[in-house]
């Protein structure tokens, strides 16, 4: 039954531009990590464990190794200009490839409660994971992107391994356009169909 599925409280996507504007005004690494998580529609653990070695700023790609992914398959994330500017804001000289991108104040990775705490402090009763639903609803309601491209951004496994490998290669440009459209929407530059 559908009731058995655990639904994470999501922000209606119509409220996303206003929320993102408020989030960008907040200080601290956790707010930056949350902003990046929303822009890339990644899972919070993927962002919290992210290292600089996974990022290719020139190619504008973030490659999450399979051992850090829920489905154990490497996940390539096209980075929108907005996502890149978050990375530029936290980048410092002398960082090594295995340095965490969003380090906890005392070193190491941020805890899973840190990003949720930002939402709580902002007075929202939504979950970090629910932001992925906001993206999915937005994509389904307002864009013409194919469903498998929308799902691929969420690293949901659709189809056989061979099919997925084929589609991954084909879909990167579409996914880049999708991530750029999502970032533009989050920034209040929405052009709905």
Role assignments for model-derived ranges:
Residues 1-3, 120, 162-163:
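Short glycine/proline-rich turn/loop motifs
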Residues 6-10, 37, 73, 77, ...:
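Hydrophobic alpha-helical scaffolding
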Residues 10, 63-72, 84, 144, ...:
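Catalytic-site neighborhood detector that most strongly recognizes the C-terminal catalytic loop/helix
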Residues 17-31, 40, 77, 85, ...:
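Short, basic (Lys/Arg/His-rich) helix/loop patches that form interaction surfaces
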Residues 57-59, 81:
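Residue-level signal for tight coil/turn positions that link beta-strands
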Residues 1-50, 58, 64, 69-73, ...:
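Basic, Lys/Arg- and aromatic-enriched nucleic-acid-binding interface segment
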